[in-house]
């Protein structure tokens, strides 16, 4: 690294940050995270702010590089039609010819995120034709404490419930589309943190208040039947079978599992087939413990 390179990169990243600032979709989702979190670093854009970028030094980058780009902090995943032994031999030969400094493993410090939201309701005006709206649900993982269900399955049950209530075939989505409350898609994003599940549901709609009201009511129903569970499990199994035709998708999923759980879920098919209505109801019943935030991006003329 040189000071010249650092200065050049500062300019490039600053331009990117300014571009994000002008994108309503980005501001909707990350604005929601900013409203939900109080201490968790996920409240910030990965790119940081312009003032953050200006403070970065050559020495900061060297420390980050040595901590991040080191074999002790890496894993390799190869998917496709190849000889595993040959692949391992090639990688081992290449790595044996390289020298690396002693690895100073970073100490991970997690800030305890409180069970509250920074902002319950937030509005801003941007260059949009139709208001963009999001509702964020913050569900504490300790709500499921005492259940004899491992954390991976809890997440699957939570995700299954959200698909039943808000997915493509859900009653709510059909209601909102048939009444023209929404005319486009409805996006759902699940964020799994150390202490919380955070689900953000977002749309473009001329009726933000009604949409927010119906989303909250639908989440609070906290009911699920056996037919729903069987239907969603079968859909998940079908998607899993098709998914294995996507080499890059498989690679990405393995990466996610290793990062999230420290290992790949080889038995995901068996896990899906073991999901049942009794456990689903136990998980759904505990969703009464949650808090919400709502974000609305309005057209400029409504300022």
Question: Which functions belong to the PLM regions below?
Answer:
Residues 16-19, 116-130, 238-254:
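Short, low-order "capping/linker" segments at domain edges
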Residues 9, 16, 32-33, 135, ...:
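Active/ligand-binding-proximal structured segments within catalytic/core domains
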Residues 42-46, 70-71, 75-133, 137-142, ...:
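An aromatic/glycine/proline-enriched structural segment found at the starts
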Residues 1, 94-102, 180, 217-226:
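A common structural junction motif
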Residues 1-22, 210-213:
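Active-site-adjacent, His/Asp/Glu-enriched structural segments that form or flank metal-binding
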Residues 91-95, 157, 161, 211-220:
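Short amphipathic C-terminal alpha-helix that caps PH/PH-like domains
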Residues 28-48, 75-79, 134-138, 173-222, ...:
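M16 family metallopeptidases and their MPP-like homologs
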């Amino acid at each position: 690294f040189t000071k010249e390179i650092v200065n050049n990169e500062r300019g490039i990243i600053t331009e990117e940050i300014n571009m994000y600032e002008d994108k309503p979709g980005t501001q909707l989702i990350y604005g929601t995270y900013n409203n939900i979190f109080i201490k968790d670093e996920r409240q910030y854009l990965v790119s940081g702010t312009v003032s953050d970028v200006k403070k970065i030094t050559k020495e900061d980058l060297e420390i980050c590089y040595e901590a991040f780009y080191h074999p002790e902090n890496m894993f390799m995943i190869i998917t496709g039609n190849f000889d595993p032994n040959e692949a391992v031999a090639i990688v081992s030969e290449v790595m044996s010819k390289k020298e690396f400094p002693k690895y100073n493993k970073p100490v991970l410090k997690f800030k305890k995120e409180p069970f509250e939201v920074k902002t319950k309701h937030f509005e801003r005006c941007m260059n949009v034709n139709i208001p963009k709206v999001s509702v964020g649900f913050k569900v504490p993982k300790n709500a499921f404490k005492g259940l004899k269900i491992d954390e991976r399955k809890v997440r699957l049950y939570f995700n299954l419930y959200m698909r039943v209530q808000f997915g493509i075939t859900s009653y709510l989505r059909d209601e909102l589309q048939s009444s023209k409350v929404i005319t486009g898609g409805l996006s759902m994003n699940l964020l799994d943190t150390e202490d919380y599940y955070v689900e953000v549901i977002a749309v473009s709609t001329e009726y933000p208040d009604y949409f927010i009201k119906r989303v909250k009511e639908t989440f609070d129903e906290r009911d699920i039947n056996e037919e729903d569970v069987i239907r969603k499990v079968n859909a998940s199994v079908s998607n899993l079978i098709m998914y294995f035709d996507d080499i890059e998708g498989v690679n990405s999923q393995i990466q996610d599992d290793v990062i999230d759980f420290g290992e790949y879920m080889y038995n995901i098919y068996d896990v899906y087939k073991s999901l049942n209505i009794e456990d689903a109801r136990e998980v759904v019943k505990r969703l009464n413990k949650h808090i919400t935030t709502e974000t609305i991006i309005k057209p400029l003329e409504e300022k």
